[in-house]
Amino acid sequence: MELGLGGLSTLSHCPWPRQQPALWPTLAALALLSSVAEASLGSAPRSPAPREGPPPVLASPAGHLPGGRTARWCSGRARRPPPQPSRPAPPPPAPPSALPRGGRAARAGGPGSRARAAGARGCRLRSQLVPVRALGLGHRSDELVRFRFCSGSCRRARSPHDLSLASLLGAGALRPPPGSRPVSQPCCRPTRYEAVSFMDVNSTWRTVDRLSATACGCLG
């Protein structure tokens, strides 16, 4: 088919579509931005995943456990039990009732007490430390010696003669010689003696026989 001139002129005047710009630079820029974003997100610290395991066991409160044991804290010290309320002190015992005069007199004058009193007042051997210079024997010494002597009453050892003599003197029926008075009871005197030794100021040993008593008795 042949085209006329008019057709050519029509084709020559139809506008041709213009060439679109290339999209490759834009796509490349977008890819670069996405890679940078992924890199920044990958470098951020991640919290470690929690480990799976048995739950922690909580310490039981301190206190008394079955069997008399006591729970302990982590420090190893046992918790003291709460203080118990103090109990009131028991009342003091009631004082014994007062004894009548007769009972007290009977108790005070019992045979045991009378025997002890008589033994304390009776003739017996006694002992005491004394200085040698005080013996009156003329020895010069700075030492102390054990001096034993007899002392006490002998009223329970009086004979019928002693009892009669005391009665006559008390009634005035017996006139003793002037300047003297008879003794109406025995005397507590030593019955045995022992020697005593000591050192004088010249470092010389001295011994005195029959100086200290070893036994006593009522004589006379």
UniProtKB/Swiss-Prot annotation:
Protein name: Artemin
Residue ranges of the propeptide: 40-107
GO cellular component, as recorded: extracellular region; extracellular space
Secretion signal, residue range per the UniProt entry: 1-39
InterPro entries named among the record's database cross-references: Cystine-knot_cytokine (IPR029034), GDNF_fam (IPR043401), TGF-b_C (IPR001839)
CDD domains: TGF_beta_Artemin (cd19381)
Keyword terms of this UniProt record: Disulfide bond, Glycoprotein, Growth factor, Secreted, Signal
Organism listed in the record: Homo sapiens
Source organism phylogeny: Eukaryota, Metazoa, Chordata, Craniata, Vertebrata
Biased composition (Pro residues): 47-58, 81-98
PROSITE patterns referenced in this protein's UniProt entry, alphabetically: TGF_BETA_2
